């Protein structure tokens, strides 16, 4: 492994387009050979409302709102978010984001995780 790596998030595959219309999700972890961190970019269209959330067994995440506004739901708490807000989420907390009228763009930084991942879907959680 090299001592450094570089990748452009917008040049990576959109991993969400088949799952949610208009949502853009790009994950850099496997492209930068990081042992301890993952970086992802999420873009939600205006007024996007999720139905599902997710949690993790081990992985802590920090989300930075790069643009737009919306809401974040953390377990049963819902908070407004706007540009440059930073939200830290413990692994077991179920989380999800909804976009406001101006859409929502996030950068997520994630800690260590098991090799196979540790995401836990929460289906129909935000309905």
Each model region followed by its residue ranges:
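Short acidic-glycine-tyrosine-enriched beta hairpin
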Residues: 76-92
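Beta-strand residues in well-ordered beta-sheet regions across diverse protein folds
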Residues: 65-66, 73-75, 98, 107
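A generic "binding-loop/recognition-motif" signal
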Residues: 58, 77, 93, 102-103
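Short beta-strand His + acidic residue motifs that chelate non-heme Fe in jelly-roll/DSBH
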Residues: 52, 72-73, 89, 94-101
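A short, N-terminal "cap"/entry segment at the start of jelly-roll beta-barrel domains
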Residues: 1-37, 46, 52, 118-127
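Double-stranded beta-helix
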Residues: 3, 96-127
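Short, conserved beta-strand element in jelly-roll/cupin
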Residues: 41-45, 55-73
């Amino acid at each position: 492994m090299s001592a450094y790596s570089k990748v452009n998030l917008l040049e990576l595959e959109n991993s969400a387009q088949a799952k949610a219309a208009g949502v853009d999700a790009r994950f850099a972890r496997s492209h930068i050979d990081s042992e301890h961190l993952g970086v992802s970019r999420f873009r939600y269209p205006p007024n996007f409302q999720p139905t599902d959330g997710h949690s993790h067994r081990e992985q802590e995440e920090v989300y930075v709102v790069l643009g737009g506004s919306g809401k974040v739901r953390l377990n049963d708490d819902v908070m407004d978010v706007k540009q440059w807000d930073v939200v830290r989420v413990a692994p077991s907390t179920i989380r999800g984001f909804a976009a406001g009228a101006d859409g929502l763009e996030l950068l997520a930084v994630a800690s260590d995780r098991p090799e196979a991942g540790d995401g836990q879907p929460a289906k129909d959680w935000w309905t």
